[in-house]
UniProtKB/Swiss-Prot annotation:
It catalyses: L-lysyl(20)-[histone H4] + S-adenosyl-L-methionine = N(6)-methyl-L-lysyl(20)-[histone H4] + S-adenosyl-L-homocysteine + H(+); L-lysyl-[protein] + S-adenosyl-L-methionine = N(6)-methyl-L-lysyl-[protein] + S-adenosyl-L-homocysteine + H(+). It comes from Xenopus laevis. It is found in: Nucleus; Chromosome. Residues 199-320 form the SET domain. GO terms for biological process: cell division; methylation; regulation of DNA damage response, signal transduction by p53 class mediator; regulation of transcription by RNA polymerase II. Keywords: Cell cycle, Cell division, Chromatin regulator, Chromosome, Methyltransferase, Mitosis, Nucleus, Repressor, S-adenosyl-L-methionine, Transcription, Transcription regulation, Transferase. Belongs to the class V-like SAM-binding methyltransferase superfamily. Histone-lysine methyltransferase family. PR/SET subfamily. Pfam families: SET. This is N-lysine methyltransferase KMT5A-A. Protein-lysine N-methyltransferase that monomethylates both histones and non-histone proteins. Specifically monomethylates 'Lys-20' of histone H4 (H4K20me1). H4K20me1 is enriched during mitosis and represents a specific tag for epigenetic transcriptional repression. Mainly functions in euchromatin regions, thereby playing a central role in the silencing of euchromatic genes. Required for cell proliferation, probably by contributing to the maintenance of proper higher-order structure of DNA during mitosis. Involved in chromosome condensation and proper cytokinesis. Residues 67-91 have a biased composition (Basic and acidic residues).
Length: 335
């Protein structure tokens, strides 16, 4: 017989048959036999906490038998794709068994710890993003924040302020102010004094007094009633006339003394005229009072309503003479 290769005995393990220890996951998994051949072993442990796989006990028996693979495969040269796939399946099987051994509480604590570990990382990433900005970008962002309200203010300032006259035309007010009212009232009184008109009053015989004056219309408080018309004389002439009138008992006293611009004057209304101001009777609680009215720097004595006066009411004012001689001569001055 010629020279050649010796025939190998069946079942000696050289033709690629795997031993029982390799099938059952014995010690040959970590220490495989190396007889000059390349051996591929997979032992890396990867813990998948997010999606744990099912335990091999949950698989059906048929699937368990079909899933049995060899941990060790001897091949000459490069490993085939089938051996790689078988090694990956075996790794997943080992990982699933290890995960199933861990209790559920431990897995929950580990998941919580992972969540707590990931959350601050996200916050730090946001802070790191802000810190990672260059200084120029930071200044620009700050300027943008500061300029935003300023833009609003400028827009408000630029917006035109609408006035009431933009919608409604200007009309002259018919209302009169205080100065205008006083000026018109003065002009009216000046006209009445200069013309001698006496409106709203008349002479009336009063029981126990004689002649008197009553109102023929209503007067409001502060309204002009009538002028005490007479001769305007100085104090020296007034004293001389008063002495002469005192000699005649039939002559009454119609003299009124006052001061104007630090000068004493007297209005002598003793002479009988058609003016009604001289006929108004005396009363300490009268409804009228005297007031000086200037017309071209000439004082005039007028009577003004102290309160509202009704129609038919007698006009009265206080003569102001408190001298004893006058009271003795005219006792009605006491009232």
């Amino acid at each position: 017989m010629g020279r050649g290769k010796k025939m190998s005995k069946p079942g000696d393990g050289r033709s690629g048959d795997v031993s029982d220890t390799g099938r059952n996951g014995g010690t040959n998994e970590n220490h495989p036999k190396t007889n000059g051949e390349v051996v591929h072993c997979g032992q890396a442990k990867i813990y998948s906490y997010m999606s744990p796989t099912k335990s091999p006990s949950a698989r059906p028996p048929l699937q368990e038998e079909n899933s049995v693979t060899h941990h060790e495969s001897k091949c000459l040269g490069k490993p085939s794709t089938e051996t790689r796939k078988k090694a990956e399946v075996e790794k997943k099987k080992i990982l699933s068994t290890e995960l199933s051994v861990k209790p559920s509480e431990q897995r929950e604590t580990e998941c919580n710890s992972i969540g707590e570990f990931l959350e601050p990382k996200l916050e730090l990433n946001d802070v790191q993003r802000n810190l990672a900005l260059p200084p120029e970008d930071k200044l620009q962002s700050q300027k943008m924040v500061k300029n935003k309200p300023l833009r609003k203010k400028t827009q408000r300032q630029k917006s035109p302020n609408r006035k009431l006259t933009d919608y409604y035309p200007v009309r002259r007010s018919s209302r009169k102010n205080k100065t205008e009212i006083e000026s018109e009232e003065k002009k009216r009184i000046d006209e009445l004094i200069q013309t001698g008109k006496e409106e709203g009053i008349k002479m009336h015989m009063i029981t126990g007094k004689g002649r008197g004056v009553i109102a023929t219309r209503d007067f409001q408080r502060g309204e002009f009633v009538v002028e005490y018309h007479g001769d305007l004389i100085e104090i020296t002439d007034a004293k001389r006339r008063e002495a002469s009138y005192a000699q005649d008992s039939a002559t009454g006293c119609y003299m009124y003394y006052f001061q104007y611009l630090n000068t004493s004057y007297c209005i002598d209304a003793t002479r009988e005229t058609g003016r009604l101001g001289r006929l108004i009777n005396h009363s300490k609680s009268g409804n009228c009072h005297t007031k000086l009215h200037n017309i071209n720097n000439v004082p005039h004595l007028i009577l003004v309503a102290s309160r509202d006066i009704n129609v038919g009411e007698e006009l009265l004012y206080d003569y102001g003479d408190r001298r004893k001689s006058s009271i003795d001569a005219h006792p009605w001055l006491k009232n």
